[in-house]
Amino acid sequence: MLVRMVSTALQIAADRLAALLTGGGGGLADPGGGHLEFDAVVRLRPLTRSVAPPEVWAVDGGQAVVADARCLQLVVARASRTRFCRGVCELEDEGELRAFLLGGKENRAVAVGLGLGIADDAAVDLNLLRDHEEWVAVDRCVEEASAGAMILVDGDLETDWRVPPSWMSGLLARASSRDITVAAVTKRSSLSRGGAPLLGCLEIDAVHELGPRAMWWAPIARSRAGARVVAARLDADAPYAFRVDLSPGADPERALSAMSALCDDAGFPGYPYPLTVADRLAACPGWLRQDTWFEVDDLLDRAGVPHDVRQRAFADRHDLMERF
């Protein structure tokens, strides 16, 4: 019989991983760096589907590196919006594809042009730019949405660390004053229980406590902006539960019951369908990056930049090692 040799380091890591995944308890934490105040006890609660909000907006962002010279980067970011009224999609807005030049002194010029209270000397990267575009789009939705509407956001209700917390608090306060619920859905959550992924633990607990096809929710924490953070399985056929952040003033069970009515699409059970549309609109696939570079290359040519200068500035020399 062939016996596979396992290194000591790998065995130690596997043993530790096994202990974390099967530990069954421990405190809640957010290794992702969120500023959350966790509930003392997390209790699963059954969820019953109601009717979808009459007006639903969804926002998602996209980003891409078009050209990378390491010391300089040409990047693009955008945020897309969609609006559903009584189940009918009435708006698909890809959003403006905004280009930014990053690197060295260029970063300050970019930071100065941003809003959301971002400091002029803030460190700028592509993640911040995408976050900025998304929250600007959410702010527009709050201004345009009708009373009773729900605005869905990809991610959570915590801004990038370079955006002052007061900006998010102000946004959510404006939404609440207009009877608008802002709900953020996180596809990849860093929340943990005893070091193990929290959502996976709750999914297993729910099967034992409520049954394999039960819809459920569980309050978890509050954010520094006052948002209610919960875990929720929003369709009986959903393979996974999600972290959902709900704006202050929203009744969690009522909001989740209404949101679940948006989560019965056969292709994406358990995930709000309007967000899948926004995700598709915001995507920045390879062909888009290539088309954008062709436009930039043409503009550089018109500006008198020689072809060999353009080629050598953005050549991927590491690619030389990956030809074989």
Where are the regions a protein language model picked out?
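Two-metal-ion RNase H-like nuclease active-site motif
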Residues: P54-A64
